[in-house]
Amino acid sequence: MGIEESQICNPSDREFLSVDILNIVTSSLSLMGSALTIISYIWKKVRRHRIQKQQIQQQQQQIEKGGLLSSSITIGNGSSHYGGIGGGGGSGNGTGIGAIGGPHGTYKQPTSKLPLLIFMLSIADFFTSFFIIISQSYLINNSKSYSTPYSPDLKIHFSPCIILRAIIQFFFLSTFFWTTCISYYLFHQLSSPGEEKYLLAIFNVVSWGIPFAISMVITMTNSIVVNSDGWCEVAKPMELSLWFLPLFLCLLVCSIYYFRLRRLFRSKFEYRLQINDRLKQLDSTISRRLTLYIVVFVICWLPDVIQHFISFFSKCTFFPLLILQNILTPSQGFWNFWIYSYTNKIARFTPSNDENKRLLQ
């Protein structure tokens, strides 16, 4: 008996059911992790806005007090005495107000776009997990209705299975592209720091627009089909070009940027060895945390890539790999939340210089 005919390549219905349940469990963890990341980001934005508002009010009060103090000196001492002392007082007030209004009003501290990019990635992770839970629960509870078309006479086939698969496809692809955008952004900020006016707009077009176009194509061309197990999957020709190829390219680009980012970080901060070993340790820690987003993406999707490679040469559904795939693939949102939490801890306890603010805060 060949390996393709063995039990390891032909899981039973009960084993497929266990995979579905495992998928729901890991997706639930990812859903909670993504939700916590989203809530944390929004809360930080609201808190920062309140602090900035309070600072502006305090600055205005100090400016008003400074103006009243100048007026009282002028009225109390007369114009001749004000000319001798008021010049010094005016200079003092001017310096005080300048220290308040100048730096805070004109100098804009460098801030990282990384939290916003992680927020967008978390939105994609959240909805991916949400619709996976709905899809798998529907399949377990009513497999017949799950794959039954709404209207067989329509040229374009629609069923709960097809619609949910298209939505999951969209959000999964979005996580691919957002992670790739994050890897590019991190490398760009280290290699040639500076604001790019349309960078976020480009990221949004790439990470939402391309997945939407791909999902529409596979839906409108009836490329989402129901297999013998009741699952919906993309037909082989489309799966290769519109699922596996984007995934493989994103993994490749992220891997390239990961190694380039590590090499660039080491070369850029190598001089700190001669200044302070603690600073080098902090920079090394920051580097590891930042690149973890890329590493998690690669690890979570590597089993899926291997499974696709196997399917090109064999009909074997390698069950151990299928289990690993259903543990890692839906759990990306959970691991991203874990990295986000650690990154924020490092940002909180790291000396607040321009380099760290541009990369983390």
Curated annotation (Swiss-Prot):
Keywords: G-protein coupled receptor, Membrane, Receptor, Transducer, Transmembrane, Transmembrane helix. It is a multi-pass membrane protein. Gene3D superfamilies: Rhodopsin 7-helix transmembrane proteins. The gene is crlC. GO terms for molecular function: cAMP binding; cAMP receptor activity; G protein-coupled receptor activity. Belongs to the G-protein coupled receptor 5 family. It comes from the Eukaryota. Its main location: membrane. It is found in: Membrane. Residues 1-18, 135-166, 219-238, 314-318 are extracellular. GO terms for biological process: adenylate cyclase-activating G protein-coupled receptor signaling pathway. Residues 40-113, 188-197, 260-292, 340-361 are cytoplasmic. This is Cyclic AMP receptor-like protein C. The chain crosses the membrane at residues 19-39, 114-134, 167-187, 198-218, 239-259, 293-313, 319-339. InterPro entries: GPCR_2-like_7TM (IPR017981), GPCR_cAMP (IPR000848), GPCR_Rhodpsn_7TM (IPR017452). GO terms for cellular component: plasma membrane. Receptor for cAMP.
